[in-house]
């Protein structure tokens, strides 16, 4: 059996801790034979555990403590600590592992709820489970969210080789915002969401680059954001914004400029991968 969970990008600029979009990069988990103890073979390195302290197995055992150990093989295209939802993908993979082996018959809504409890908010986990674009909120311990089709466009991910921990990126954010600035920030997010619902990526893109919640504070940790926005604008893109907490920058563009834009971004003197992606529409899947 195989479990596949997509990468996700959160925020899309002003949709801070609320908007998320599934992307065509994947964490794939192959479930092998039963074993005396849990072992997860993977291609990540970097101190990621191979035993039951691995997030995937830990999550599964929290849901189903009596699971029989198996040999697992994980292949992950989602680089860690880059703002592409690697931790959310691991959590969702663990939920799917427990659901599959213990035959829990969890609904998608239950999977989102469990994952959001673990991660703290639904912005990455909801699109990882459901696919496509999700707008959500966690209020008094309850999750509220709406899934909708994202407008057709090209997505170009500029993924620096250097990591940026979410904890570090959150550390530069202020504890509070002045009321007038918060109202303005909220109105920007509202217009962005309305524009996406209307398939107006030109207006949505303008709002994406006017975020007041987090990007101006995080830009000091991601100095390449300004360069990428300039290249994106010069090549006809709709917008470029931080993916999650960064350092990845996601560029939204018409499909007919995607190849040229990708080539232009590859010429920047920054050690990075530049990938042409799509919106992932299915979310987490199990192949039997």
UniProtKB/Swiss-Prot annotation:
Its EC number(s): 2.7.1.39
Keyword Repressor included in the entry's annotation: no
Gene Ontology molecular function terms on file: ATP binding; homoserine kinase activity
Substrates-to-products reaction catalysed: L-homoserine + ATP = O-phospho-L-homoserine + ADP + H(+)
Pathway terms, separated by semicolons: Amino-acid biosynthesis; L-threonine biosynthesis; L-threonine from L-aspartate: step 4/5
Database matches in InterPro entries: GHMP_kinase_C_dom, GHMP_kinase_C_sf, GHMP_kinase_N_dom, GHMP_knse_ATP-bd_CS, Homoserine_kinase, Ribosomal_Su5_D2-typ_SF, Ribsml_uS5_D2-typ_fold_subgr
Localization annotation: Cytoplasm
Binding site for ATP: 79-89
Keyword Cytoplasm: yes
Xref: SUPFAM superfamilies: GHMP Kinase, C-terminal domain, Ribosomal protein S5 domain 2-like
The entry's keywords: Amino-acid biosynthesis, ATP-binding, Cytoplasm, Kinase, Nucleotide-binding, Threonine biosynthesis, Transferase
GO CC annotations on file: cytoplasm
GO term, biological process aspect, one: threonine biosynthetic process
Domain of life the protein comes from: Bacteria
Pfam family, one: GHMP_kinases_C
Family affiliation: Belongs to the GHMP kinase family. Homoserine kinase subfamily.
Role, per record: Catalyzes the ATP-dependent phosphorylation of L-homoserine to L-homoserine phosphate.
Protein name (Swiss-Prot/TrEMBL): Homoserine kinase
Name of the gene encoding the protein in the UniProt record: thrB
């Amino acid at each position: 059996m195989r479990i596949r969970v997509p990468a996700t990008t959160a925020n899309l600029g002003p949709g801070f801790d609320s908007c998320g979009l599934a992307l065509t990069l994947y964490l794939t988990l192959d479930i092998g034979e039963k074993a005396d103890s849990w072992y997860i073979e993977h291609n990540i390195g970097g101190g990621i555990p191979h035993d039951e302290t691995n997030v995937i197995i830990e999550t599964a055992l929290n849901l189903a403590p009596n699971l029989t150990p198996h040999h697992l093989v994980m292949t992950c295209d989602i680089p860690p600590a880059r703002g592409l939802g690697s931790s959310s993908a691991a959590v969702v993979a663990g939920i799917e592992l427990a659901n599959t082996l213990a035959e829990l018959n969890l609904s998608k809504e239950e999977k989102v709820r469990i994952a959001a409890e673990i991660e703290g908010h639904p912005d990455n986990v909801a699109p990882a489970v459901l696919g496509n674009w999700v707008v959500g909120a966690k209020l008094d311990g309850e999750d509220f969210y709406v899934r909708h089709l994202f407008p057709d466009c090209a997505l170009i991910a500029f993924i620096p080789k250097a990591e940026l921990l979410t904890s570090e990126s959150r550390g530069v954010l202020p504890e509070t915002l002045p009321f007038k600035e918060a109202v303005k920030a909220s109105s920007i997010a509202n217009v962005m969401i309305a524009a996406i619902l209307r398939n107006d990526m030109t207006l949505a893109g303008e709002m994406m680059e006017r975020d007041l919640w987090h990007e101006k504070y995080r830009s000091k940790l991601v100095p390449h954001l300004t360069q990428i926005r300039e290249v994106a604008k010069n090549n006809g893109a709709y917008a470029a914004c931080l993916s999650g907490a960064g350092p990845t920058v996601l560029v939204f563009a018409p499909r007919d400029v995607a190849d040229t834009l990708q080539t232009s971004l590859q010429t920047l003197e920054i050690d990075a991968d530049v990938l042409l992606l799509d919106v992932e529409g299915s979310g987490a899947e199990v192949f039997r």
